[in-house]
Amino acid sequence: MASPLKTFVLRMPATGLVRSSPKASFSTISAARPASCLSRSPFRKQCFKPAISINKSFSRAVSDKPQPETVQATPQPAPSNVLPPLDWNSFFKLRVKRRRYQMLFSITNGIFAGSGGAIFLSTGSAEPIISQIPLDPFMTLGLMTLAFSGLGWLSGPSVGNQVFYILNRQWKKQMTQKEAIFFERIKRNRVDPTNSSANNPVPDFYGEKISSVAGYRSWLKDQKAFNKKKTANFV
């Protein structure tokens, strides 16, 4: 009766056995197989089977679950500093206010300029000029002091205008636009001054006395009355 080892060796094919040592006749270690053999092996799917399997129903439920929508915050518009449009009544009020500024600085500048001129003349710095004028020195000094005051008075409107626009700079652009339109209407509707006379003087040729919309309408009536009176005198 054959031994179990001999029976096992006889049953194994000769190609799958190699010598392990000179003393051992054959070894049970099989030779290395190419990688292509693994692809044909029935155990390939079991060897490379993923360790964790995801249930199909669970994955479908997760995919069908609505994703939370990301709401983008819309930027809030910055508060605009746009001023309301300037109406005509407000324009005339600002115009009257500007005229008061001009008058105030005319008076102030006239007083300060006259005082400064008097102090300057009292030092005797203008004595060579005064001696050449064929008038009484006191009268000459008085006239020169009045000249200094007049220069201060004339500079008042320019200074007052600048101060007014510094304090009301937000209305400067709109006032400039309105003023251009206003003077264009004055120029278009005013009468011809060449036809004026002592009995029929020109009514406010530059529109300086207009201080409201009602005042402008009254100014238009005065222009029409001037033209009617001119026609009546001509006939």
UniProtKB/Swiss-Prot annotation:
Q: Which GO terms describe its biological process?
A: protein import into mitochondrial matrix
Where does the protein end up? Mitochondrion inner membrane
- Matching InterPro entries, A to Z? Pam17
| Membrane topology category | Multi-pass membrane protein
Is Transmembrane helix one of the keywords UniProt gives this record? yes
For this protein, the record's Pfam families field holds: Pam17
> Could you confirm whether the keyword RNA-binding appears in this record?
no
User: Per its UniProt entry, which superkingdom is the organism in?
Assistant: Eukaryota
Q: Where are the transmembrane segments?
A: 103-123, 133-153
Gene Ontology CC annotations of this record: PAM complex, Tim23 associated import motor
Alphabetized, the UniProt keywords read: Membrane, Mitochondrion, Mitochondrion inner membrane, Protein transport, Transit peptide, Translocation, Transmembrane, Transmembrane helix, Transport
**Stretch forming the transit peptide:** 1-61
Entry's family note = Belongs to the PAM17 family.
State the function annotated in the UniProt record: Component of the PAM complex, a complex required for the translocation of transit peptide-containing proteins from the inner membrane into the mitochondrial matrix in an ATP-dependent manner.
Q: Quaternary structure?
A: Component of the PAM complex, at least composed of mtHsp70 (SSC1), MGE1, TIM44, PAM16, PAM17 and PAM18.
Instruction: List the protein's name.
Output: Presequence translocated-associated motor subunit PAM17, mitochondrial
Which organism does this record belong to? Gibberella zeae (strain ATCC MYA-4620 / CBS 123657 / FGSC 9075 / NRRL 31084 / PH-1) (Wheat head blight fungus)
What gene is this protein translated from?
A: PAM17
